[in-house]
């Protein structure tokens, strides 16, 4: 990907603190109520969009917190960062664009602040700008939860 981007998309999502009632909102709990507080620092996504006309689409992920940069195999496989790859897979991104996806959060992974969920929301929100129509913030959050439960088969509540 050497040509200049046609478009640059930036998206952010807050991490969360104070997970009161966590895990009461899962399918196996029946019903529950969770109180989260979204705070700074945000999870950040920046996507450089370039034309891929006339050749196979290329998607590059730069997971800055992990110091990893790699090309996503086509068709998309869940290999290096399944959460990120599943987000790319669930969105119907046009085939005629190359994507260079940069992801970063000041909050470290595994810190119990919902960083992974925030990264998913920011990435899905950015990818939504490449697809027809627009999802609401609530729909983006629900889609992020579907990525974890349906695409990856994980147990998770709604953050």
What are the residue ranges of the model-derived segments?
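ATP-binding N-lobe of GHMP and related small-molecule kinases
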Residues: 2-113, 125-137, 142
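Short, conserved phosphate/pyrophosphate- and ester-handling motifs at nucleotide-, phospho-/glycolipid
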Residues: 116
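Active-site signature of alpha/beta-hydrolase-fold catalytic machinery across serine-
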Residues: 122
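Alpha/beta catalytic cores of group-transfer enzymes, especially the acyltransferase/condensing modules
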Residues: 135-159
């Amino acid at each position: 990907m050497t040509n200049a981007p046609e478009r640059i998309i930036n998206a952010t999502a807050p991490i969360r603190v104070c997970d009161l009632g966590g895990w009461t909102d899962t399918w196996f709990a029946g019903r529950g109520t969770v109180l989260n507080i979204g705070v700074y620092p945000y999870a950040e996504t920046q996507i450089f969009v370039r034309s891929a006309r006339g050749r196979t689409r290329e998607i590059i992920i730069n997971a800055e917190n992990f110091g990893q940069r790699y090309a996503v195999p086509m068709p998309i496989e869940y290999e290096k960062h399944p959460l990120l790859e599943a987000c790319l897979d669930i969105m119907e991104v046009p085939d005629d664009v190359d994507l260079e996806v940069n992801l970063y959060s000041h909050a470290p992974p595994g810190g119990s602040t919902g960083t992974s969920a925030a990264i998913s929301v920011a990435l899905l929100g950015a990818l939504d700008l490449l697809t027809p129509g627009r999802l609401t913030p609530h729909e983006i959050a629900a889609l992020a939860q579907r990525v974890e439960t349906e695409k990856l088969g994980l147990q998770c509540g709604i953050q």
